[in-house]
């Protein structure tokens, strides 16, 4: 009895998508399409694991680099305001309080340090100044922070980026 190997099943379509309020009536099944769903409990588990990992990253003092335009072009984001930078280091610090939107289960003790970059300037139609501007605007519109608070938040992110650049690139060149 022969069995087809999964890596030869090219007629199978695997699609992963998320819709917040999908109803079973909206799902359609096609013999060639694989479908799955997650319960609210499973989504909570995933968010809890993500919060645990973000806390580990924060405690290890690692810095996450965000490339928003690149993530829009080649990632699964449709809009800048969906970028996880707003969860990693929320512009509204109250969101990190236990039960807040960035700390639903009270696992996290603080923000993750982040910097913003442009990724590959030859491929991505943006500048560092534009990345900061767009993310700042999203903070004001979607995270409901004042222009002053959004400016301070972006300035902290910008300083982190400069600090990382200097430590990675300038220290070794000054010793030559």
Question: Which role does the model predict for each range below?
Answer:
Residues 51-60, 129-130, 134-176:
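Mid-to-C-terminal alpha-helical segments outside catalytic/metal-binding sites
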Residues 74-85, 124-137:
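Histidine/acidic-residue-rich catalytic or RNA/ligand-binding cores of hydrolases
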């Amino acid at each position: 009895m022969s069995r087809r190997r999964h890596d030869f099943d090219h007629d199978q379509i695997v699609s992963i998508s998320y819709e917040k309020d999908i109803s079973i009536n909206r799902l359609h099944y096609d013999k060639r399409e694989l479908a799955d769903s997650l319960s609210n409990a499973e989504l909570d588990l995933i968010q809890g694991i993500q919060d645990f990992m973000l806390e580990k990253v924060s405690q290890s003092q690692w810095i996450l680099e965000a490339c928003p335009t690149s993530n829009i072009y080649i990632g699964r984001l449709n809009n800048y305001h969906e970028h996880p930078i707003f969860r990693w280091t929320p512009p509204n610090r109250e969101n990190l309080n236990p039960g807040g939107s960035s700390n639903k289960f009270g696992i996290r003790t603080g923000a993750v340090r982040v910097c913003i970059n442009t990724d590959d300037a030859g491929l991505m139609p943006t500048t560092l100044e534009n990345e900061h501007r767009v993310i700042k605007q999203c903070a004001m519109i979607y995270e409901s922070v004042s222009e002053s608070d959004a400016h301070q938040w972006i300035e902290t992110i910008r300083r982190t980026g400069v600090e990382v650049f200097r430590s990675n690139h300038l220290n070794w060149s000054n010793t030559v």
